[in-house]
Swiss-Prot record:
SUPFAM superfamilies: FKBP-like (SSF54534), GreA transcript cleavage protein, N-terminal domain (SSF46557)
Transmembrane segments: none
Keywords: Coiled coil, DNA-binding, Transcription, Transcription regulation
Protein name: Transcription elongation factor GreA
InterPro entries given in the database record: GreA/GreB_C_sf, Tscrpt_elong_fac_GreA, Tscrpt_elong_fac_GreA/B, Tscrpt_elong_fac_GreA/B_C, Tscrpt_elong_fac_GreA/B_fam, Tscrpt_elong_fac_GreA/B_N, Tscrpt_elong_fac_GreA/B_N_sf
Coiled coil: 45-72
Protein species of origin: Aliarcobacter butzleri (strain RM4018) (Arcobacter butzleri)
Length: 161
């Protein structure tokens, strides 16, 4: 089984979501399913079929979150050097062709969020940034095509999800 790095914040988020599904969402859905079952004819009972489908989806989510947790390796980015890009590093870079600046933080897959500038360590850009330092130029091959970036700064910034 391949291990997946994640921050403690990411791990806590996943375990909280799992806890909510197991202790709140699933029991409430089981009750709704039982109540719908008591309404009679199950063939034409929309409430029953809806609750049954919802329970199935919740069980799938629980299984997926359990799989994430079983593969998790918690890494504390504060213990890593950030003079070069590594897990948990925040990187300021500029597209040398357009002068557009970007800031990304490298995190675990379940923590990634494009809107927040948090990219998975497995993403094409993160893989190519690893080990680089401020001042380096990077010819990145990305799904949208090739881009050239200059790394302006590599540092640690507290990760908030």
């Amino acid at each position: 089984m391949e291990k997946e790095p994640m921050t403690l914040a990411g791990y806590n988020k996943v375990t909280a979501e799992l806890d909510f599904l197991k202790k709140t969402e699933r029991p409430e859905t089981v009750i709704a399913l039982d109540e719908a079952r008591q309404l009679g004819d199950l063939k034409e009972n929309a409430e029953y079929h809806s609750a049954k489908e919802k329970l199935k989806l919740i069980d799938i989510q629980i299984a997926e979150l359990n799989a994430v947790i079983s593969k998790a390796v918690i890494i504390d980015p504060t213990t890593l050097p950030h003079d070069r890009v590594s897990f948990g590093s925040t990187i300021d870079l500029v597209d040398v062709d357009t002068d557009e600046e970007f800031t990304y933080t490298i995190v675990g897959g379940v923590e990634s969020s494009a809107e927040k500038g948090m990219i998975s360590f497995n993403s094409p850009l993160a893989k190519q940034l690893m080990g680089k330092e401020a001042g380096d130029e990077l010819n990145a091959t990305l799904p949208g095509g090739a881009k050239t970036f200059e790394i302006l700064k590599v540092y640690y910034k507290e990760i908030s999800l």
